[in-house]
Amino acid sequence: ITLKNKKDMETPQTGYQVKTYNVPVKRYCQTLDLRDSPELIAEYRKRHSQAEVWPEILAGIHEVGILEMEIYILGTRLFMIVEAPVDFDWDTAMARLNTLPRQQEWEEYMSILQQAAPGMSSAEKWRPMERMFHLYNT
């Protein structure tokens, strides 16, 4: 299967492939709501497409140590999964990310589309979610 065909096969109904790493990882899950406007939601989707996302934003995410970041959407609700090495410190990484090129500009623009106040950093807008069930521990 070619990479293009794999992507074509990934849907909410068929599931999404997950990368594995040679190091232990931990996961952060967060949520945020978009403004209830079809036009703004379409713009948010467009800005996060591979063709539109700013390369400086992707570079910054990698630079602070994040291995993977996925954002899922249902209506106006966003759900983000972040995977990072077990020694990753969220607060330190987010403080550093906020100083990297174009990050503040990106956050300002995204805040127009999100239910968030202008000037808020990514770490301030996205709310951490508590894991309430874990199959491996049952």
Describe each PLM feature range.
Residues 127-133:
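Eukaryote-biased recognition of C-terminal alpha-helical segments
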Residues 1-9:
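N-terminal amphipathic/basic-hydrophobic helices that include classical n-h-c signal peptides
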Residues 25-43:
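Short glycine-/aliphatic-rich beta-strand segments at the starts of folded cytosolic domains
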Residues 10-25:
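Acidic, low-complexity proline/glycine-rich segments
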Residues 28-33, 67-100:
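Short, well-ordered beta-strand segments in beta-rich or mixed alpha/beta enzyme
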Residues 64, 85-125:
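An amphipathic, aromatic/His-enriched active-site/gating alpha helix that lines ligand/cofactor pockets
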Residues 40-65:
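Short amphipathic alpha-helical segments
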